[in-house]
């Protein structure tokens, strides 16, 4: 069974928590899906100082969570459809997704990724992008399993 980690910098862990928990539950028969939420005093302080400090604090938190095939979400990333997304899931037994904080992700961090994708050309609130990512993970797992969720 594959392992999928969604890593996010998020001040309020309760945003869409019920919906995300439902996607995790529905995905259990296909993969071990984990929601890793990070926010601490160091990140809060860094964000109050400015962009460079904030990006550095995100990098430090995320460093220990780089496992398997690494994918960053970025509005300038590659646009892919659900079938291409499902193919990525099928080819990798361990995947880590990274959603940036208020200032995104550093260029240095993004350079260490195996892939950078965009969910849409629109700029989204991080909590909405995260919910969309969980839905697409579930959809991709269903596509790969021949489940009728994706019609």
Curated annotation (Swiss-Prot):
UniProt xrefs under Gene3D superfamilies: 3.40.1280.10
Q: Superkingdom of this entry's organism?
A: Bacteria
Q: Does the keyword Methyltransferase apply?
A: yes
Recorded E.C. number(s)? 2.1.1.177
Molecular function terms, GO-annotated: rRNA (pseudouridine-N3-)-methyltransferase activity
| Pfam families for the chain | SPOUT_MTase
Record: residues binding S-adenosyl-L-methionine: 73, 100, 119-124
Annotated GO CC locations: cytoplasm
Top EC category:
transferase
Q: Which reaction does it catalyse?
A: pseudouridine(1915) in 23S rRNA + S-adenosyl-L-methionine = N(3)-methylpseudouridine(1915) in 23S rRNA + S-adenosyl-L-homocysteine + H(+)
Q: Where in the cell is it found?
A: Cytoplasm
Q: Which InterPro entries match?
A: Alpha/beta_knot_MTases (IPR029028), RlmH-like (IPR003742), tRNA_m1G_MTases_N (IPR029026)
Q: What is the disulfide pattern of this chain?
A: none
Alphabetic keyword roster: Cytoplasm, Methyltransferase, rRNA processing, S-adenosyl-L-methionine, Transferase
Q: How does it assemble?
A: Homodimer.
Q: Which family does it belong to?
A: Belongs to the RNA methyltransferase RlmH family.
Q: What does this protein do?
A: Specifically methylates the pseudouridine at position 1915 (m3Psi1915) in 23S rRNA.
Query: What name has this protein been given in UniProt?
Result: Ribosomal RNA large subunit methyltransferase H
């Amino acid at each position: 069974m594959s392992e999928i980690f969604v890593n996010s910098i998020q001040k309020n862990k309760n945003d869409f928590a019920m919906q995300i928990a439902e996607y995790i539950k529905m995905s259990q028969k296909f993969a071990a899906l984990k929601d890793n939420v990070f926010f601490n005093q160091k990140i809060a302080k860094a964000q109050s100082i400015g962009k460079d400090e904030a990006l550095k604090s995100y990098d430090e938190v995320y460093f220990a969570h780089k496992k398997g095939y690494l994918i960053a979400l970025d509005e300038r990333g590659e646009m892919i459809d659900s079938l291409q997304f499902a193919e990525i899931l099928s080819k990798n037994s361990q995947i880590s997704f990274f959603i940036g904080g208020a200032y995104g992700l550093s260029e240095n961090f993004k350079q260490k990724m195996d892939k950078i994708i965009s969910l849409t050309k629109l700029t989204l609130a991080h909590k909405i992008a995260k919910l969309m990512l969980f839905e697409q993970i579930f959809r991709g797992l269903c596509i790969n399993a021949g489940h009728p969720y994706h019609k």
